[in-house]
Structures are given as structure tokens and as C-alpha cells.
Regions:
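Structural motif corresponding to alpha-helix initiation and N-cap regions
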Residues: 10-14, 71, 97
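Acceptor-substrate binding/catalytic loop of class I
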Residues: 52, 56-73
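Conserved class I S-adenosyl-L-methionine
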Residues: 15, 26-53
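A short SAM/SAH-binding and catalytic strip from SAM-dependent methyltransferases
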Residues: 1-12, 31-32
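Short, hinge-like loop/turn segments at secondary-structure boundaries
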Residues: 1, 44-48, 104-105
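Helix-to-beta-strand junctions that scaffold the AdoMet/dcAdoMet cofactor pocket
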Residues: 10-11, 22-25
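Class I S-adenosylmethionine-dependent transferase superfamily signal
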Residues: 17-20
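A C-terminal cap/extension of S-adenosyl-L-methionine-dependent methyltransferases
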Residues: 75-117
Length: 117
């Protein structure tokens, strides 16, 4: 099963992920990283909700995004909910490169391979 850049729009994150790992033995989840340094900088410099290409191209009032979480938040969630992370790939989509150092700060997207622990 694959869930691509939609988890931030889901009302019941725990329910969706629990069902995913129950039904599909190994699942792939990609998430936008709202801890990305460019988003942090935009918010700090302008005092306004950040906008960028991808999932943040909406205005604050019409965005489908209801959850703003980071790579670190998702990893903590998986640990707390007994979801095993087999692999994490953190990406800088603008540079089209994998991020190895400080992914919570330097990656705008992450892909996780998960299953029940």
C-alpha cells in the first residue's frame, strides 16, 4: 500500500496508518516536512503562513492541510504506535538529492517504508 503526500490532510492519522499496516504487510508513506528550513525561514521573516511549490501552494484559508508535522514528529509517532520504520529516505526535491545530514531541517519530503512492529 502507498500513501503519497496525503497524511497531512487526514482527520484520523492513527486510524489510517493502523489499517494500512494491518492490511498491507509493508507500506510506503511519503510526507511533506513542515520543519524544512525554507518554510521556517519564510514564517520567521514574513510573519505569515509559508507558501511554496507542492503541498504549500494554497493560501492559509483554503488549504486541505490540517496537520503540520515534521519528519521527527512522524518518527516519534511511529515509535509510540508500535509501527516499524524499515527505511527513511529524506529528500530535497529542489536539488533532486537525498538529504543525509539533519533531514528534519534540510529535507522538504520524506519517504518511509513501514510495517507493524
Amino acid at each position: 500500500m502507498v500513501l503519497s503526500q496525503t497524511l497531512q490532510t487526514v482527520q484520523d492519522v492513527e486510524g489510517v496508518l493502523t489499517e494500512m499496516v494491518r492490511i498491507g504487510r509493508t507500506c510506503i508513506v511519503s510526507i511533506p516536512n513542515f520543519g524544512y528550513h525554507q518554510l521556517r525561514r519564510m514564517l520567521a521573516e514574513t510573519g505569515r503562513a509559508p507558501k511554496s511549490a507542492g503541498v504549500l501552494h494554497y493560501e492559509w484559508y483554503n488549504t486541505p492541510n490540517i496537520r503540520f508535522f515534521t519528519i521527527a514528529d512522524f518518527e516519534d509517532f511511529c515509535r509510540e504506535k508500535n509501527i516499524r520504520v524499515h527505511r527513511r529516505i529524506a529528500l530535497d526535491t529542489e536539488a533532486q538529492a537525498e538529504v543525509l545530514e539533519h533531514p528534519n531541517l534540510n529535507a522538504d519530503l520524506a519517504i518511509f517504508v513501514i510495517s507493524r512492529a
